[in-house]
Every structure is written in C-alpha cells, then in structure tokens.
Amino acid sequence: MFNSMKRILAILTVGLPALFQTSAAQSTAANTVWIRPENAKSPPVWGIHGGIVVGLWPASLEGNIPGSEGGPRGLLRVGYELNGVIYLINYIAVEPLVDGDMEFSEVRPSVVDGKLGKLFWAASDTTGGFSPYANTTGVITHPDKSHPEVEELSVYILMEKFADGANPYLKLTIRSDKPGELGLQLFNHKNSAVMQRCALTATMGNYSRLRLLYLKDKVIDSRQLFGGYDDIEFAEKDPYPVSQMLRNKSGDPVVMAESNESFNQLASWPQSPPYLARWHWRYRPFYKLTQYWRVDAGGYDSSLVVRVNGRAKYWSGENADKSNYIDVPGGPAFENFELRENYHNGQQFYFGLSLKPAKELIDGF
C-alpha cells in the first residue's frame, strides 16, 4: 500500500492540488439526481442534488479559492448542494482509540510525507492504494425492495494505518429518499489493532456558529455551557448519555445542533483587519442548516453518548501565539459535535444537514 502512496507523492508535490481547486465534481446526466465523478481520474466528490455532498483532499467542494488545497487532510469534506452551487459546511474526522490512546486523523502526520493529516482515498471495494483521484464513480443500488425507485450511492473510504495500529475504513452511503443524510459505516481491516472506540466527529461547528444543542428534554446553549471561557484552547464538558437523546418516529436516537443567529447575523462579518485577513471563517452559504447525528433504533448499545466541545476563538492550527486568533462573533460555539460508542465492526452512524430549523425538523422527523 505504501509503495503506491510514495509513487503518488511525486504527483502531489507538482501542483495537483491546484488542479482540484477549479473543479468540484461532474454531475451525471441531467435527468438524474446524483453528483458523481465522470471517471476514475476525476476529482473525488460524490453527492446528490438538493442535498449532501462529500469529498476528499485535494478536491475543493467550493471550487477555486486562492491558497486552498481543498482544506486540511485526514478529513471528509461535507457540503450541501442547492440550486447548482456546493458549499462546504463541515469536516468529519476519524479518531480511533487503542489502549486508551486516541489518534486524530487530521493532525497526525502521514507516514508518506510527514505532513499533518492522514491520507484518505476512495475505492469501490476494500482494496487498493492511495490516489488523489476519485478511483471510483461509486456504486448505485436499490436497497429497499418495497420501494424499487429508491437508489443508494455508496463508496468506500480507505486511509493510512494509524501509529497505534488502528486500521479502520468507512463505507459511505447516500439514499435518494434521504438526500440530506450521509451514512457512515465503520469497519476494520484484519491487521488492525483492537479499537475500543472509533469516533467520527464533525469538527467545524464554529464555522456555522452552532450554539444550540437539542436533546430530549432541553436545549443546551454553548454560551451558557462555556460562559466566561475566553482562551484559545478547546473547552470540554461531560458528554450526554443516549437516554437524553431525541427519538424520531422510528425510535432512532437523534441529536441536533443549529446556530442561534438569524441568517443575516450569521452571514455578517466584522470589518476589521484581523477578520478580513481570516475571511475563510466567514459563513458563505446563502441559507442556514440544521446539523444532526442519528443511529438506527436497535443498532446501538448503552455506551452511546453525545459529545461536544467548544471554542471561543476560531481554530488557528497548533499556533500558541494568541494574536493569531480571533473571537467567534457572538460568543463560544460548539466545535466538535459527535456520537461516541464502544466500537464494533460494521457500526453505523448518520450525519445529516437540513434546511429546516431544528424545532421544525424535530416535529416531522
């Protein structure tokens, strides 16, 4: 596998990321709903019109942004397509726990080039080495015999083995009848170390200024939960057990998060030099979205919890100089937003985006 990675490294260092800045993905024929690569050499982006989109480094979901290489490595880029335009909304990282030690896919160095971020790549099955291209257009199936019109797009996401021996991989799915939802199923290769947990965490809640966390009997406000915190580190509190999660009509545990701000407030940006120099944190979509996690009823155990942390200032890498940080307008917001559960091979999570406000989504979910 790593010999294949090293051969590709030479390509990566001669400007390939710039190629992907200019093209997010090619749609299939106009009468279909899917966003898929045209061929194996296209940028690695998959999704559905009017719904969720997922991509891998070095592809940028938003096209040509100066200085961009599609965002950090070691992450799934999760976006939303509306009216022909895709916007990046969040990232999802992979965080395996082995013998009490947790690794972070976006900040641990690659064994290929020593740069931060594990290499992720797509495949139509569980074999093959790294490529910066799509490798596969994805597989379309009909998962519901009672509704043969429903289609499901699936693709495998493979990644470098972690330093602690963890060797997980993902199967991503999007269903045509649930366009706002991304299925993420976790597996491990046979040579993987035993994982106590393998968290999938949405890492960029500050971008959407997520401040309201909806549980069964209460709404947690990040401004109150992290009130008074004004440092550059993450603020952490205890997780919430599955017993406190919402349930949808099928009995699935669900947790939702949204901004407390109106769209006009969310889209505004301070007009001062420190903020203008960090405009990539400005919220760019022309709509608000509710974000949520879900698990299937009966498909989880009592270890399932909701975990959030917070930040009062936007992330600025590992930089310890506080002058490189700017305050999140409006106060502390949730940054990492995730479900955690004891690992088992094949466990399934769903991450969703909806144009509906959380209260409206809860009523009809």
Descriptions of predicted regions:
Residues 1-5:
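N-terminal secretory signal peptides that target proteins for export/translocation
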Residues 10-18:
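Bacterial N-terminal signal peptides
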Residues 21-25:
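Sec/Tat signal peptide C-region and signal peptidase I cleavage site
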Residues 26-118:
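Beta-strand-rich N-terminal accessory domains
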Residues 27-52, 57-60, 244-365:
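Beta-strand-rich recognition/accessory modules
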Residues 105-117, 122, 225-271:
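Low-complexity, serine/threonine/proline-enriched polar segments
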Residues 112-180, 185-191, 195:
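Extended, loop-rich substrate-binding clefts of extracytoplasmic carbohydrate-active enzymes
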Residues 171, 177-238:
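Acidic (Asp/Glu-rich), glycine- and aromatic
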